[in-house]
């Protein structure tokens, strides 16, 4: 690695769905992991709506969630990520609620990352070809608000104080 390249000691990746981090920051995470960074992957939703297979109906959601977690753990192994947190919120229904921000604040306070990677909460479109999923925007907004002000302000969520 370049001696001037920033490599955090601990980094946290916070994304809505299994597979989101691979499309957005996977290369950075792999590079950082290879350089010795400890990475915590936080996946907010279960990914249980991530199929348009006409043979699947609501009865398959638990099976799909288990498959998505297995796939995410395998992807994280390839990237060099050894710690994964699944919050298991419903896929396709994510909102940047106080409850979600509190869950993320708890995890940030627990691991104390030097860097947090997430999506852009304001990005509705990427170029001319991709309409950003509302779960991505909600996850990014909640992650940003958990980083600041919540994680660093002791009197926000005092029940999380050690």
Labelled PLM ranges:
Residues 1-14, 97-162:
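Metal-dependent de-N-acetylase/amidase catalytic core
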Residues 1-112:
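Active-site rim/loop-helix segments in enzyme catalytic domains that contact anionic ligands
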